[in-house]
Curated annotation (Swiss-Prot):
This is HPr kinase/phosphorylase. Residues 209-218 are annotated as: Important for the catalytic mechanism of both phosphorylation and dephosphorylation. The active site is at H146, K167, D185 (proton acceptor), R250. Mg(2+) binds at S168, E210. Both phosphorylation and phosphorolysis are carried out by the same active site and suggest a common mechanism for both reactions. SUPFAM superfamilies: HprK N-terminal domain-like, PEP carboxykinase-like. GO terms for biological process: regulation of carbohydrate metabolic process. Homohexamer.
Length: 323
């Protein structure tokens, strides 16, 4: 996993309010980060944070009530040896959860070794879940793509195409028909799971849509709160093409896909021409995609009916010759 620039300080700043973290020792270790080799070999955020585990000392160590009770039961020599081994390998930081008080000798050792030590009243399980989700998000593959990203009938749809084809105008018409804007011009996509890509708007462009001749429109102010969305999963790409595009297929026999962060996203191409109602065509494409996700493929059904009709015709012709 890629965790360049992620330090104890940045993790604390991003999560202190959510899980009520307090920094009690090791302030000099603010720049401490994950071991580079360990982070590279980690396959998921579950490898990066967990309950106290001396077998995996390089990860974030969370100590709840059971771990603190175990620690306090150890004799002085064993406690000193085990914590010495843990601190020596420089974990990013330690968290004392469940509202437990940090043992004085552990706090002193963290201070001397500049190992950040946090405390929180939140349960250890909740701390681990929160930090795993946080690390998954910041380390996930991401890309910024050009287009208009909309919520159409509950489906995340990215409208793409060359400059000047009317993507923003089409987006504005779809918004006026009751659909929602996620982002215009630049869309930040992040892959959060094996089949899950989430799209968001960069903070600078939040709620804004740029239309030639009108300038920047604040969609939230003009159309209301329900006209904008914070995020959506991308399920469909609509590619606008010029009428003279030689690669356009009127009736594509094979499904078309666009690779987004290694995940194939279903794509449809729509020709832009005078008199065509693009908003209706996009809505129809979305409805058709919903049917495809339910296992209903209209084109395949038509081809099957056509094939059956041709076979029946061939059989009747053969019988006619025999007569």
């Amino acid at each position: 996993m890629e965790l360049t620039g992620v330090t104890s300080q940045s993790i604390f700043d991003d999560n202190a309010a959510d899980i009520k973290l307090s920094w009690v020792a090791g302030l000099e270790g603010a720049d401490r980060a994950f071991d580079v080799e360990f982070a590279r070999e980690a396959t998921s955020a579950a490898d990066l944070v967990g309950h106290l585990n001396l077998i995996h000392p390089n990860r974030i160590q969370v100590l709840g009530k059971p771990e603190i009770t175990y620690y306090q039961r150890l004799d002085d020599e064993t406690r000193k040896r085990q914590m010495g081994e843990l601190i020596l390998l420089e974990p990013p930081f330690l968290v004392i959860a469940d509202g437990m008080e940090p043992p004085p000798d552990l706090e002193l050792r963290c201070t001397r070794s500049s190992t950040p030590l946090f405390t929180t009243p939140v349960s250890s399980a909740a701390v681990i879940d929160h930090l795993r989700l946080y690390l998954s998000r910041i380390s996930a593959p991401r890309v910024t793509m050009h287009g208009v990203f909309l919520d159409i009938l509950g489906m995340g749809v990215l409208i793409m195409g060359e400059s000047g084809l009317g993507k923003s105008e089409l987006g504005l018409e779809l918004i006026s028909r009751g659909h929602g804007l996620v982002a215009d011009d630049a869309v930040d996509f992040v892959r959060l799971g094996p089949d899950f890509i989430e799209g968001r708007c960069p903070p600078l462009l939040q709620n804004l849509l740029e239309v030639r001749g009108l300038g920047l429109l604040d969609i939230k102010t003009i159309f209301g709160e329900t006209a904008v969305r914070r995020k959506m999963k991308i399920k469909l790409v609509v590619q606008l093409v010029r009428r003279n595009d030689g690669e356009f297929e009127r009736l594509p026999l094979d499904s078309q896909y666009l690779d987004v962060l290694g995940l194939p996203i279903h794509m449809v191409k729509i020709q832009v021409a005078a008199g065509r109602n693009l908003a209706v065509l996009v809505e129809a494409a979305v409805r058709n995609t919903i049917l495809r996700l339910r296992g209903i493929d209209t084109l395949r059904d038509f081809m099957d009916r056509q094939r059956a009709a041709m076979q029946a015709d061939a059989v009747s012709r053969g019988q006619g010759r025999l007569l």
